[in-house]
Amino acid sequence: MFTKSERSSFKYWFAHWCAFQMTALNLKHWKPKYLLHDIEKPFLKLFWDYKKVQKWHRNHNSHHTEYKGQWDTYEMVIDWECSRFTKAEAQLNAYDTLVKMMRKEPDEKMRKKLYENIAPVLYDLNLCSLVGVNALYYNYIKNPN
């Protein structure tokens, strides 16, 4: 487990990379491209401080909601699901991460985008049931207040 202050280290990056690979394998959704998951981070860290690397990474990688193009929702969900294995402050699974994001998101369009793109992936990977998918819809889309 790593604290927030330790996340800029190579040791953390490698532990996260391993946890991501393990999670993708356990969910039976591993792809060869996942070998390159977050691969640029240790190299960028040689030139930039961690905050700049983090911002660049989130804006340029399709497994982050900050990415402006088409999201890679499976990689995103796997990333969320594995964070509890390496982040002391982020002990949520992928479903709970989505709930937290939807609860905090003030923009109705973004909540809808999150729901429409992520809920089917959670269900497909057996990370939530139809009851969980419906609960997301009723609590954060249909009746957000």
Task: Outline where the language-model segments fall.
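Metal-dependent phosphohydrolase cores
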Residues: M1-N145
